[in-house]
Amino acid sequence: MKKHNILFVSTDDKINIDISKQLENIFGEFCNIDNLVYVNRINIELSSYELVVCSDNDIKEYIHNNIDKNIPIVIVHRTINIENINKIISIENDSDVMVIDAYKESADETAKIIRKLGLININLIPYYPGCDKSKCEIGIITGSRNSIPQNIKQIIDIGDKVIDINTVIEIFTKLNISIDK
């Protein structure tokens, strides 16, 4: 069986490694997966790829505007690993809790995911380097401990975010891969 070729592009080394591993675990049987960290521009020929998966809309726009308008692109959406929800539920109601990440977009995304769960009544405050919101004592992180403010006394690590099932289905669909074997 001929494998499909996928390129994953992100702006962050850690995200690139994490998502590439997840893509390999899910699609490795059907696809060859390459990855690339986007800094200021992409110097790669995309014609050998059937699909580009990227970490955000800025990368998608860059590819469509500067490289190839016709290549199919999927933006990867991530969610919290269901195994770690109990860590969030254990937070006392009405607590102020920082959602800490190295990037604003990722901190906002994690806070949004937690709110969508609707399981708890806490005040989530996205935090990333450069913002001035350091009054909380509880912080939620998704694996990385690089951006934790000094005033945080309790760290709740909910692990790396995982690829959302809707993204998985979209990739299978774009590549015309039947999910049932």
Residue ranges and their predicted role:
Residues F27-V37, L117-Y127:
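Short beta-strand elements in bilobed, periplasmic/extracellular small-molecule ligand-binding domains
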Residues S134, S144, K174-S178:
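Ligand-binding grooves and catalytic loops that recognize ribose/phosphate and carbohydrate rings
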Residues K2-F27, V39-I42, N57-I113, K153-K181:
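Ser/Thr/Gly-rich flexible loops in soluble cytosolic domains mediating phosphotransfer, phosphorylation
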Residues C31, E50, I71-P72, I120-I122, ...:
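A structural micro-motif
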Residues E45-V52, S134-I138:
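Short acidic/histidine-rich motifs immediately flanking catalytic phosphotransfer sites
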Residues Y38-R41, S55-E61, K104, P126-G130, ...:
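Short, polar loop motifs at secondary-structure junctions
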Residues K135-I138, T142-G143, I148-I165:
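Structured core of small recognition/catalytic domains
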Residues N35-S47:
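N-terminal beta-strand-loop-alpha-helix module at the start
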